[in-house]
Amino acid sequence: MIIKENFEIKNLTTYKIGGIVKKVFFPETQSEFSELLREQPDAIVLGSCSNILFSSNGFDGEVILTTELKQFEIRGTHVFASAGVKGPLLSQKTAEAGLSGFEFMIGFPGSIGGDVCMNAGAHGQSISDYLTQCCLFDKESKEIVYKKKDELDFSYRHSLLKSGRYILLHAEFDLKKGTPEEIKSLIDRNMEFRKNIQPSLAHPNAGSVFKNPEHDSAGRLLDKAGVKSFDLPRAKVWENHANFIVNKGDATSEDILTLMVMMYNAVKKQYTIELKPEIIFLGDKTEKEEELWNILSH
C-alpha cells in the first residue's frame, strides 16, 4: 500500500483543482481496500477524480484512492473488474476479446467504482445494462456483501451506492459476442462524437456539470439560456457544449461554483427548471462555497 501525507489533491483531479489532503491511501489489493474501509470509516473514497470538484481549501482528513486496484479478468462473455479499472481500458480489452457492450465507455475518464456508483452512461447506454452483480463493502456492518443488479436501485445517473453505505470492491458483467469490425466501427464513432462535442482533458474539466432533467437535455437548456458566453478570469463555460466548465489555468473551486450558480440561475430564470448538479463537491468547504453549493443542491 502507498501512503502519502499532506498531498495536493489537484494533481489527481481532472479539474486540476483541490487543496491539501491530510493523508491519502492507495490500496493495491481488495483486502487492503476493505481493511482500510474498516479502519477509516470517515475517509473519502475516490477513483479517477473525474466527476468531482474538490475544495481548494483541502481536506483535514483521509482519502482512499482506488487507482491502484487495476485487476480485471475476461472469461467468455463474463467480465470481472476491480473498482480502479478505467472504463476506456475495459472497453479496449473487451473489444479485443470480441465482446460488444462497452463501446460507449471508450472516452470515459472515470473508473469502474465511480461509473457503477453514478450509473455512468453515454449514447443511450448505461453501465448497469451489462452488470450482473457487485461485491461491496457495507460500511454499517463492516462486512463484504454481494448484491445482484436488481438490488442496486439503478436509474438515470443513480444507484444504491450513492447513499454512501456501500463501497464497490469489484463488479461483474456479462457482455455479448460481436464482430471485430462492428465493435471497432462503433468505438471509432463514439470517439469522434466525444472529440467534437466535449473538451479534452487538455482543457481541465470534470465532464457534464448538470444532470439532464426528465425528457430534456441540460446542454440544450443551458445553450438556449445563453451560458456559452459566461467567462470568468480563471474558468469559463466550454464554447462547444454549454454543459461543461473548463479550468483556464489556475481556477479555484469557488470559481467553478460561481459559474455553476450563474448557469443554474440562467436556466431557472428562462425555463423555471432547477437543474441538479452531476458533479460532486467534496472537501472542507469555505463559508462562501457552502453558500454557493446550497443554492445548487437544495
Listing of model-derived features with the role each one plays in the protein:
Residues 3, 71-74, 131-134, 235-237:
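Generic structural motif
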Residues 4, 11, 17, 52, ...:
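Phosphate/pyrophosphate- and phosphate-bearing ligand-binding catalytic cores of soluble enzymes
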Residues 18, 24-30, 53-71, 117-149, ...:
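Structural signature of FAD isoalloxazine-binding scaffolds in flavoprotein oxidoreductases
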Residues 39, 46-48, 130, 203-204, ...:
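Short, basic and Ser/Thr-rich N-terminal targeting/leader segments
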Residues 87, 91, 105, 109, ...:
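Hydrophobic, well-ordered secondary-structure segments
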